[in-house]
Amino acid sequence: MLTRITLPSPAKLNLFLHIVGRRPDGYHELQTLFQFLDYGDELTFTLTPEQPGIRLAEPVPGVPDSDNLVIRAAKALAATTENTLPGVTIHIHKRLPMGGGLGGGSSNAATTLLAMNRLWELNLCEDQLAEIGLRLGADVPVFVRGHAAFGEGVGEKLTPTNPPEDWFVVLKPECNISTGKIFSAEGLTRDTPKIKIRPAFEGDASRYRNDCEDVVRKLYPEVNQSLEWLSQFGPARLTGTGACIFGRFPTESAARIIWESKPSGITGFVAKGVNHSPLHKKLTELK
């Protein structure tokens, strides 16, 4: 029986994000293109039969354990069985910024669902895990599925796609963005015409955009300044509601040249876009 497992929890980018309408329940209808990065957090799960319960090895600063998506994911999974389950201690090695639009919390939740499904030998299928994930957050299912995808609805209706696996410079301006503030903004575009799946990743990338970007640029000058700087070298875009932005480059060396010249005070990283999640690659190796 497997008692310990260490797994990656990759970042995602929204290569574009269009808001195509608003539902009666107030949620926005989206069309977006998700792609993973070969960069992210790392989670270690250790079963503790002698110590029941679900716990973090160390608290995440600023996030109560009861609100942490890792704890919530493990508890949601445990609720699917009446069997007595061994306890687990979870160590989170964070590299992704919180609230950056990179899906860090959602990715952590998905990694937890897949890891604990295996450690607890629950044998739930991917569809069941994605359904649990959706209750935790709209971005969790794409991490559970593990393939780049065209997302619709609130982002949960997924069609696998294979956009080019380019290199990215990802920058994190020094500000924290409220997603609720962006989606409730008066000037937010909410009527972008729907596109079909095939054109979602073909042709000129500048034809597509992030509908949140104009509002974010107006409300957060730090993001605007970073986008202006990165746009000197090619199309630059917001991911999610930010604050992270990204620029696409054909090679690692081209990306690193730009990275080395970034303004002081801005954090971030260089990473490769990948269509098959590093999490799922690792799980396949462990079979």
Curated annotation (Swiss-Prot):
Molecular function in Gene Ontology: 4-(cytidine 5'-diphospho)-2-C-methyl-D-erythritol kinase activity; ATP binding
Superkingdom: Bacteria
Claim: Signal is one of the keywords in the record: no
Pathway: Isoprenoid biosynthesis; isopentenyl diphosphate biosynthesis via DXP pathway; isopentenyl diphosphate from 1-deoxy-D-xylulose 5-phosphate: step 3/6
Enzyme Commission numbers on file: 2.7.1.148
One GO-annotated biological process of the protein: terpenoid biosynthetic process
Catalytic activity: 4-CDP-2-C-methyl-D-erythritol + ATP = 4-CDP-2-C-methyl-D-erythritol 2-phosphate + ADP + H(+)
Residues the entry annotates as binding ATP: 97-107
Catalytic residues (UniProt): 12, 139
Xref: Gene3D superfamilies: 3.30.230.10, GHMP kinase, C-terminal domain
EC primary class: transferase
Alphabetized UniProt keyword annotations: ATP-binding, Isoprene biosynthesis, Kinase, Nucleotide-binding, Transferase
Extent of the signal sequence: none
Free-text function comment from the UniProt entry: Catalyzes the phosphorylation of the position 2 hydroxy group of 4-diphosphocytidyl-2C-methyl-D-erythritol.
Family membership: Belongs to the GHMP kinase family. IspE subfamily.
Protein name: 4-diphosphocytidyl-2-C-methyl-D-erythritol kinase
Natural source organism: Marinobacter nauticus (strain ATCC 700491 / DSM 11845 / VT8)
